[in-house]
From Swiss-Prot:
SUPFAM superfamilies on file: Prokaryotic type KH domain (KH-domain type II) (SSF54814), Ribosomal protein S3 C-terminal domain (SSF54821)
Keyword rRNA-binding recorded: yes
Protein name as annotated: Small ribosomal subunit protein uS3
Subunit structure: Part of the 30S ribosomal subunit. Forms a tight complex with proteins S10 and S14.
InterPro entries linked: KH_dom, KH_dom-like_a/b, KH_dom_type_2, KH_sf_prok-type, Ribosomal_S3_C_sf, Ribosomal_uS3_bac-typ, Ribosomal_uS3_C, Ribosomal_uS3_CS
GO molecular function: mRNA binding; rRNA binding; structural constituent of ribosome
PANTHER family: 30S/40S RIBOSOMAL PROTEIN S3, SMALL RIBOSOMAL SUBUNIT PROTEIN US3C
GO CC list: cytosolic small ribosomal subunit
Record NCBIfam families: rpsC_bact
């Protein structure tokens, strides 16, 4: 089962938390879900060069939306004197539904810095995709990503690239693995991502698994 299922979804509720934290009744659920999709799509499009890994959305009340942006380049997102993050907050507020009085929801943005981007599967996948789009040999791009992740402290990494590699007429799959990637172990902190590279010969799929160690449950002190 661990070989087939998405490693991130497999561990939600065990060692990972949801990226969307809110509850809604039947009447409001669809509207809030589409709000989330608009917010995520806008951030991914406008901060494509800011190395954004995750976007967390939390709603404590119906009129408040808290957005946490995990990025390896916080300075690019914040801007000089916080100008860029204020522009982002204003634009995200316009994407929310208005209340009965025509007012937009209050949006609060929290920037979370990723100190080791080479341990983020999504950022590693984006790096490989960028190399492939710049016509770097796929083996060189994959091995370079594996070496950087290993130097950053990864216990294991697996990278898989599929498609018309090097412009071949027949599509195929190539993969490299370094260390161990225990997909069946729920306590194993495995980050997974699927990315896409758009080349002159077609799109290439990139799957990345990074094993960052185990997350053990904390023991509760008995009184």
């Amino acid at each position: 089962m661990g070989q087939k299922i998405n490693p991130t979804g497999f561990r939600v509720g065990v060692i990972r938390d949801w990226d969307a934290k809110w509850f809604a009744d039947k009447a409001d659920y669809a509207n809030q879900l589409h709000e989330d999709l608009r917010i995520r799509k806008y951030i991914e499009k406008n901060l494509a060069d800011a190395a954004v890994d995750r976007i967390e959305i939390e709603r404590s009340t119906k009129s408040r939306v808290d957005v946490s942006v995990h990025t390896a380049k916080p300075g690019m997102v914040i801007g000089k004197g916080g100008s860029e993050v204020e522009k982002l907050r204003t634009q995200l507020a316009k994407l929310t539904d208005r209340d009965e009085k025509g007012r937009s929801k209050r949006v609060f943005i929290n920037i979370v810095e990723i100190k080791k981007p080479d341990l983020s599967a999504h950022l590693v996948g984006q790096q490989i995709a960028g190399d492939l789009e710049r016509r770097v040999a796929f083996r060189r791009a994959m091995r370079g990503a594996i070496q950087r992740a290993t130097r950053s402290g990864a216990k294991g990494i697996k990278v898989m690239v599929s498609g018309r590699l090097n412009g071949a007429d027949i599509a195929r799959i190539e993969q490299y693995t370094e260390g161990t990637v225990p997909l069946h172990t729920l306590r194993a902190d495995i980050d997974y991502s699927w990315d896409e590279a758009m080349t002159a010969y077609g799109n290439l799929g990139i799957k990345t698994w990074i094993y960052r160690g185990d997350i053990l449950p904390q023991k509760k002190n008995s009184k």
